Design a protein with these regions (language model features):
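Short aromatic/hydrophobic "clamp" motif used to bind/position activated sugar donors
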Residues: 2
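Conserved catalytic core of nucleotide-sugar-dependent glycosyltransferases
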Residues: 9-122
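C-terminal accessory extensions appended to soluble enzyme cores
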Residues: 86-182
Length: 182
């Protein structure tokens, strides 16, 4: 099995019996966290990590580009598409996506050099506002905003979760990661 994942995405493999899965592609539905390992964005699942068997892998980028939607059998376009598939399996409780695990200054630097830096700069958010957003435990941007709305600024409220919901390594080593736990 080949898993493609960003460095800030940790797939949860604990409850998966890979021998029983017959689907061509696995999509991991992951909880999304900001700033700390236990500050979760509620009511949102990230689908960054994907997997397939080695013999099905065309390229890592092909797997990364797969749409995170299961298409109906009557969708004729799925026969000719390299990104639309019907034979997906979504892995619920599929892991953790840790984004912006940085302080305010590092987040500002990231967003200024980020792909959407023009959108960030158009919102006129400064370092003090980023610090305020982090202290109030809100997401730096709204992941549900479309292009007509302002994405950056005060996003949804984050919730603090119990340590039993974070990866075992983090849970078992709180002294190492205490700075990154709220």
């Amino acid at each position: 099995l080949i898993i493609i994942s960003d460095v800030d995405e940790i797939p949860n493999l604990e409850k998966i019996n890979f021998n029983k899965i017959k689907n061509e592609i696995l999509v991991f539905r992951q909880d999304m966290f900001y700033y700390k390992f236990n500050l979760k964005l509620s009511n949102f699942k990230w689908t960054g990590s994907k997997a397939c068997k080695m013999k099905k892998l065309i390229s890592p980028q092909w797997l990364r580009n797969i749409k995170d939607k299961k298409f109906a059998f009557y969708r004729f376009d799925t026969f000719f598409s390299s990104t639309k598939y019907r034979n997906l399996k979504f892995i619920e409780d599929g892991g953790w996506h840790y984004t912006n695990m940085k302080n305010a200054k590092e987040i500002e630097h990231k967003l200024r050099s980020y792909l959407h830096h023009q959108e960030f700069e158009a919102n006129h958010i400064n370092l003090e506002q980023i610090e305020k957003i982090i202290k109030s435990k809100k997401a730096i941007y709204n992941v549900n905003a479309d292009k007509r709305q302002g994405k950056f600024g005060e996003g949804p409220q984050l919730i603090k979760i119990n340590s039993d919901k974070i990866p075992n390594y983090l849970k078992n080593n709180p002294q190492i990661y205490s700075k990154w736990l709220d």
